[in-house]
Regions:
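AMP-dependent adenylate-forming
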Residues: 10-36, 166-168, 175, 326, ...
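Conserved AMP-binding/adenylate-forming core of the ANL superfamily
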Residues: 23-74, 94-101, 157-160, 183-189
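ANL superfamily adenylate-forming
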Residues: 29, 97-98, 102, 106, ...
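Conserved adenylate-forming
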Residues: 51-56, 155-163, 168-213, 231, ...
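Conserved AMP-binding/adenylation subdomain of ANL enzymes
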Residues: 189-208, 218-260, 275-280, 339
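AMP-binding/adenylate-forming catalytic core of the ANL superfamily
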Residues: 255, 262, 403, 408-409, ...
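Conserved AMP-binding/adenylate-forming
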Residues: 290-292, 299-438, 446-448
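Conserved C-terminal "lid"/linker of ANL adenylate-forming enzymes
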Residues: 475-479, 490-491, 508-556
């Protein structure tokens, strides 16, 4: 990390002046707002002055529920300059008051002890409803467009140190109620310089990042805002809802701005492969793209290979594909596949995998797992059994990590901290194995389905079911329930009501043929019935709870 600033604020102050480098924000109307670094820096200091005028002091938290990317980034940086601790929060899929969403806001803001929350005019009504809830009745709610206007009051910037909290990243809640991950400036700088430095993506002066990822989530926030500021990498940011409506715009922006680095979860590569037409292909040029990263959810080899094949016509280089592994507790990524080399796919015997051993196989029925690469320099991984003892090569166990990117616990949550952080190691809760130095992720330990003594990974079942015509791919959950003293498999999938009977039969038959499992129940649900986290991950445990209490809506 020699030569890099030691805090986010120091990095912001060190960025070059002039018009050539900065952040470009794409609006919902497709208009572009360009902020050179100097303008970002000036507006951050201006907003810092407004925030401290509210009586906020260094170390205080401030909630950010901003659907507008430029408002989010400017306010986050303003809070950082003021020594405050931003708390990024999902701004909601719609701007309507719903009990569940407002309850989530209340929980996060109350847990973070935030006295102030900044939003935008379009979601002001929703966020203001917090004042009617017990945990946040005294909170101050301000719309950025209305608050940061006029001449800024006097302001003296506090000294920011590497040990200071940079922000609180509340976990997605895919496995539990959200917890506040404490990211210090030293964690952020260590991770950013690792994944963007020579041992990671190998940032060059000519790089341009292009992203549609949500900024309340670590991949978008650190990967394309905070990390890029620390290493001076210009970016183009488009709104997440715009990607959902027009996936091809992601690739159009890469083409227009000669993007070199982008990142997305598995589902996004699948979506553009399916939705971009042959006519669209003729207008795209992806030859500039040297990094097409993938992470944040299970990675499917077939998805990435199909993407590479389809977009080879646009100059896409398959060696740009870069699978990775990480979690909020390690800031962002902690392992990368080696850039510029072909993706590695491990084909293993499914029967042996159910016994917890990844035995190579050439059989057509072999499971395909994608290598997530090796840890960054200065970081370590371990794979251990239930007793905490290291396991051998190709033996499945829990993945542990440690290093300067890894944080030191959850905000005012000693119980959760003690459970996940032991003897300097972060216990991820993820199952995986190592082969030839590479890490392969199998799934979450708590989601493992054990039937007749055999281990089954829910995402394997979900992927197979998602390939059935009529099932909404990416909208399938598999979980186990106890019945008569044994674990039984339940599958819930979103699909068409008219196909309900056929889909149930086809799903049960395919799962039996592929895994030797007979589902106790197959539920076919309407679109949107299955719960997801704010980052789009399936909530298996919540789905299970809803199913067990007869709350999971099914087609008749």
């Amino acid at each position: 990390m020699t030569g890099y600033p030691t805090t986010l604020v120091a990095a912001l102050d060190a960025l070059p002046g002039g018009e050539a480098r900065g952040f470009r924000f794409i609006g919902s109307d497709r208009e572009e707002r360009y902020f050179p670094y100097e303008a970002l820096r000036a507006e951050a200091h201006r907003r810092a002055a407004f925030l401290t005028s509210l009586g906020l002091k260094k170390g205080d938290t401030v909630g950010l529920v901003c659907p507008e990317n430029h408002e989010f980034v400017l306010t986050f940086l303003g809070a950082s300059v003021a020594g405050l601790v931003p708390v990024p929060i999902f701004p909601g899929a719609t701007f309507k008051v719903t009990d569940h969403y407002v309850e989530t806001l209340e929980h996060i803001l109350a847990a973070a002890h935030s006295r102030v929350v900044i939003c935008n005019e379009k979601n002001l009504e929703v966020v203001s409803s917090l004042k009617q809830r017990e945990g946040t009745k005294d909170i101050t709610v301000l719309a950025a467009e209305q608050f940061f206007v006029g001449q800024a009051p006097p302001f003296i910037a506090p000294v920011i140190t590497p040990e200071d909290l940079c922000f609180l990243q509340f976990t997605s809640g895919s496995t539990s109620r959200p917890k506040g991950v404490m990211i210090r400036h030293r964690n952020l700088v260590a991770n950013s310089t690792s994944f963007l430095g020579p041992g990671g993506l190998g940032r060059t002066p000519d790089d341009v990042g292009v992203s549609w990822l949500p900024l309340f989530h670590d991949m978008g926030l650190i990967g394309f805002v905070l990390g890029t500021l620390i290493v001076d990498l210009p970016v183009v940011l488009m709104p997440t809802p715009m990607f959902a409506r027009m996936p091809r715009l992601w690739l159009e922006l890469i083409t227009k701005h000669r993007g070199t680095i982008t990142y997305a979860p598995n589902f996004a590569y699948q979506l553009v492969t399916k939705r971009v037409t042959d006519k669209d292909l003729a207008t795209l040029d992806l030859s500039s793209l040297r990094i097409a990263g993938c992470g944040a959810e299970p990675i499917r080899a077939r998805t990435l290979l199909e993407f590479a094949d389809r977009f080879s016509k646009c100059g896409f280089d398959p060696k740009a594909l870069l699978p990775s592994y990480g979690m909020a507790e390690s800031c962002l990524a902690i392992t990368f596949h080696q850039r510029g080399t072909p993706m590695i796919v491990d084909r293993v015997d499914p029967a042996k995998m159910r016994e917890g051993v990844a035995v190579p196989s050439t059989d057509p029925s072999a499971l395909e797992l994608v290598s997530c690469g090796v840890p960054f320099p200065g970081h370590e991984l371990a794979v251990v059994d239930e007793s905490g003892a290291p396991v051998g090569e190709r033996v499945v166990g829990q993945v542990l990590s440690r290093g300067p990117s890894v944080n030191d616990g959850y905000f005012e949550n000693p119980e959760a901290t003690a459970e996940s952080f032991k003897d300097g190691w972060l216990y991820s809760g993820d199952l995986g194995y190592r082969a030839d130095g590479n890490l392969y992720i199998c799934g979450r330990a708590k989601d493992l389905i054990i039937v007749n003594g055999a281990n089954h990974y829910p995402q394997d079942i979900e992927w197979v079911v998602g390939d059935i015509e009529g099932v909404r791919r990416g909208n399938v959950v598999a979980f186990s329930v106890m019945r008569d003293g044994t674990e039984q498999l339940v599958i819930a999938a979103e699909g068409n009501s008219g196909d309900s009977a056929r889909l149930k039969q086809q799903i049960a038959q395919l799962v039996q043929e592929t895994f030797g499992l007979t589902p106790m129940h197959v539920a076919i649900c309407p679109v949107g019935a299955l719960p997801k986290t704010s980052s789009g991950k399936a909530q298996r445990r919540k789905s299970k709870t809803m199913w067990e209490s007869s709350q999971l809506e099914e087609h008749p």
